[in-house]
Amino acid sequence: MYLINLLAMIIPVLLAVAFLTLLERKVLGYMQLRKGPNIVGPYGLLQPIADAVKLFTKEPLQPLTSSPMLFIIAPTLALTLALTMWTPLPMPYPLMNMNLSMLFILALSSLAVYTIMWSGWASNSKYALIGALRAVAQTISYEVTLAIIILSLLLMNGSFTLLSMTTTQEYIWLLIPSWPLAMMWFISTLAETNRAPFDLTEGESELVSGFNVEYAGGPFALFFLAEYANIIMMNALTIILFLGAYHNPMVPELYTINFTTKTLLFTAFFLWIRASYPRFRYDQLMHLLWKNFLPLTLVMCMWHVALPIMLAGIPPQT
């Protein structure tokens, strides 16, 4: 039974990821005044299936000087972590209702750094290693602001459970009282998922393809799936934290429709940003975080700590 539950979550996520790649290519195509994929199937709808067949039937080549064990473990672990992060998300009911679901997601997203680091190191290539080092520095840096923003929101929520976020936001979205946090959170999720304009790890112009330069076929596809699963997961998390969907226990389907629509809109926003903005320089990326976001988030966190204490003496206004 547990296996069926797990598969009922994993398979739709992988399908969503497959068609997100198609959507991205279509959106970028139309933004650059061209068609995008339109040969395989009607309007190119079967392109993801063709891509999957092509990638998984290719020979998984390995460089002679690589560490074979780590080389294979890294992409497998990347996808495993990306899919495990979906388990505590309430949609409207989570697969695993944990007390510390928010901490669980933070811990797993920090573990994802290791997969990138191992893949860069195991490839035994200069480009891959530079890409991996950049990714590690970037991800660890932006984890800091993500953690502080989450802490501020949890102070308003009153618990670490994601399920209670829907109850907190019954009257007002948390986006409205904490919009500076939401703004910084969104930019940090872009950096966390290595998306443009923060895609320094895959800098085609200077690093060929970044940490996955030596990967081909199946293992490359696993990295690709992990990246896009993380993108959708981060957007889903943004919706849960800031734009809580209205949940009525009598009709839980409404929540799912509401939640999915918002997540898709945010994902489209990610693609729009990719088509519009140039890549940051590495020092600009670090300056943005350590000199702009970190002081601001710390101030906001102190404000959220002080607010309940300041207002504790006021009787409830009913």
Curated annotation (Swiss-Prot):
InterPro entries from the UniProt entry: NADH_UbQ_OxRdtase_su1/FPO, NADH_UbQ_OxRdtase_su1_CS
Reactions this protein catalyses: a ubiquinone + NADH + 5 H(+)(in) = a ubiquinol + NAD(+) + 4 H(+)(out)
EC class of the enzyme, as a word: translocase
GO biological process: mitochondrial electron transport, NADH to ubiquinone; mitochondrial respiratory chain complex I assembly
Compartment(s): Mitochondrion inner membrane
Protein's membrane topology: Multi-pass membrane protein
Pfam family of the protein (one): NADHdh
Transmembrane regions: 3-23, 69-89, 102-122, 144-164, 171-191, 222-242, 253-273, 294-314
GO CC annotation, single: mitochondrial inner membrane
Keyword line: Electron transport, Membrane, Mitochondrion, Mitochondrion inner membrane, NAD, Respiratory chain, Translocase, Transmembrane, Transmembrane helix, Transport, Ubiquinone
GO MF annotations in UniProt: NADH dehydrogenase (ubiquinone) activity
EC number(s) stated in the UniProt entry for this protein: 7.1.1.2
Keyword Ligase: no
Chain's role: Core subunit of the mitochondrial membrane respiratory chain NADH dehydrogenase (Complex I) which catalyzes electron transfer from NADH through the respiratory chain, using ubiquinone as an electron acceptor. Essential for the catalytic activity and assembly of complex I.
Family (UniProt): Belongs to the complex I subunit 1 family.
HAMAP family, A to Z: NDH1_NuoH (MF_01350)
Subunit relationships: Core subunit of respiratory chain NADH dehydrogenase (Complex I) which is composed of 45 different subunits.
Protein name in the entry: NADH-ubiquinone oxidoreductase chain 1
Biological source species: Murina florium
Gene name of the record: MT-ND1
